[in-house]
Structure formats: structure tokens, C-alpha cells
Amino acid sequence: DWSWSRGLGDVYKRQIAGLPQAAVLILLHETSEDLNVIYCLRSNNLPTHAGEVAFPGGKREEKDETLKETALREAQEEVNLELKDVEVLGEISSVQSRFGLSVTPYIGILKSNTLIADGKEIAEVFSVPLNFIKNNMQKEQKSENWDNKKVFFPFFEFENKMVWGLTAYMTVEFLKLLDIEIDLTRK
């Protein structure tokens, strides 16, 4: 049962109307062993989020009629996604980034995993088995000061790559759709 209307945690319940918009694509690829979530390692040469793990995506441009188009366009640019290779299932609730963007995640099924990092914005494309995420999402969250509050974020590490912050939070929200609950209460 894909329920796209689940709410987000209190940290992210903010008015996001009027903010600049962005969209990301949470791509899933099924193998014989597991369902895998596709992540990107951003290039170290970028002015923001350098070397961080993210989903393919970015800011909405004037030419994008919808946020879904934004997510798909960015995935084409960053990881050479062929539109024929993805089926977009829908979106989950938008979240506000700490930089004042309203980010809308879209969920897509990747029919063939032939993604290639563009080498400019994205250094590497990698997939993480869903069961690994489920079993390794940390319960002691990393904290940061955000709007003068200490905020606790979910995170997990995979092959020396840290998935944290908004990317990990959107991952947890996606897992909720699959009725996989991650205990994020602070210990």
C-alpha cells in the first residue's frame, strides 16, 4: 500500500510555500537479493554539499513545468538516467532544507541499473540494499544547530560513505511507506 500522504517529523513541519523549489529522485533497483536504493556521492569540487551523499536532483528551472520534470531532468544530467528506464511511482511530502529550499522527493523504479556519474557534479553512483539500510540506520543521531535548535538526524554508513541529514531523513520517510519503522528516538 503506497500511502503518499504520511506526515513528516516535527522538525520538518514548516511552512514551505514561497520557498525556492527543488526535487530529488529516490531511485530503486531490484536485484535477486534485495531492493536497492540508489545514492550519489557529490563531487568534492562543488561550492555546496561537496563530497556529500545525496539523491540525484536539484533546483527547479523555469523550463520545468513540474517538480517531477525537475527531478527527472536533474537525474538525466547527473547520472545519465534514460527516461525509458524509470517508472515514477509518485512523490512523498516536501521537506525544507537548512538552506531554505523546499525539496520534493519522487520515488522511481529503475528498470535497468545503467547509471553513470557525470563526473562534474557527481563523483560516484552506488546502490545500498534496503535491508542494509533497515539494519544500520543509527539511533544515535548526528546533531547540528539549525535555526538555533539542536536537531538530531538519522544516519548510516555504507562502504565509508556517510548518508545523513536530509538525504537520510527522506530515506526514513520512504521506509515508512513500506511499513519499515526506524526508531529515531534519542537515547
Indicate where each model-derived feature is located:
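N-terminal strand-loop-strand
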Residues: 16-55
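Single conserved hydrophobic/aromatic residue that forms the stacking wall/gate
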Residues: 1-12
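A structure-centric signal for secondary-structure junctions around beta-strands
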Residues: 8, 22, 34, 50, ...
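Unchanged
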Residues: 45, 59-159, 163, 173, ...
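Short aromatic/basic micro-patch
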Residues: 5, 54, 127, 165
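Buried hydrophobic packing segments
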Residues: 27, 167, 171-175
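Short Gly/Pro-enriched turn/cap motifs at secondary-structure boundaries
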Residues: 14-17, 97
